Amino acid sequence: MIDIKLKNLPLIISIASGKGGVGKSIITSNLANTLANDGHRVLVWDGNYTFPNQHIMFGVEPPYRAKDTYIGRVDLSSVLYKMNDNLYLLADYSVNEIELEIDIDKILNVFKQLITNYEFDFILIDTAAGLSELLLNFINISHLVCIVLDDNPSSLIDSYALIKIFLRFINPEQIKLIINNIIDNEDFDEINTKINLVSRNFLGQSFETIGYLPYDREIHKSIIHQELFTNSTNKQLKEYMENLAQYFIEYYKYN
């Protein structure tokens, strides 16, 4: 694993979840878009090695993907897909398109190139749901790790299990929570209380919830139409994401 205690790095954020279907990827893409719209240079790295979907979220089809550079087919500069002046995507193929065993060293070499040869303010890594060796390497190269969860009991259980394992590798202060699909403030309070009650009782730690998104049909429509809801006219949804982005902007400024 790589030690990232270096100066002048971009803020590297891994976005994880204990289970699939909680909105991790849609939050990643819209957070990146919000940060880029605010004038920051942002890279989205699709770290889902088996079923990547960030290119779907953005509605683009990059000609080259991360696995092309892992195997030496093209260099990294050919793989980084420019969506606008501030927003770039390191997309990937799913495993049924190109078979390739995970070579952690090659993936971490890409990381070294990113922080050495490119000037990004933020790198957002959209990881695969659940636990894997690759995920543990991603969290180790990240300054912050955000766990996305919702009110589904299995989401709460799996999020707790993920936190428990993460604490073996990173400091508690690096772990943040993002709650998705809330119905109202009472729903938010209930989810936040449940996950932190369990964490305090069994791990002796509580974790900061830095943002949330409501359940909204427009979010689901944006996925179907491969459009970002932060590009829509829905001011309320955009405000939720702007509040989340502001957390990272402030963190980047003062850390």
Feature map (PLM): residue ranges:
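Acidic-aromatic/histidine active-site loop/patch
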Residues: 1-12, 250-255
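Conserved nucleotide-binding/hydrolysis micro-motifs of P-loop NTPases
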Residues: 49-50, 85, 94-97, 130, ...
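Short, hinge-like loop/turn segments at secondary-structure boundaries
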Residues: 59-64, 165-166, 193-196, 228-230
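NTP-binding/hydrolysis catalytic cores, primarily Walker-type P-loop NTPases
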Residues: 224-255
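Walker A/P-loop phosphate-binding motif and the immediately C-terminal alpha-helix
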Residues: 5-47
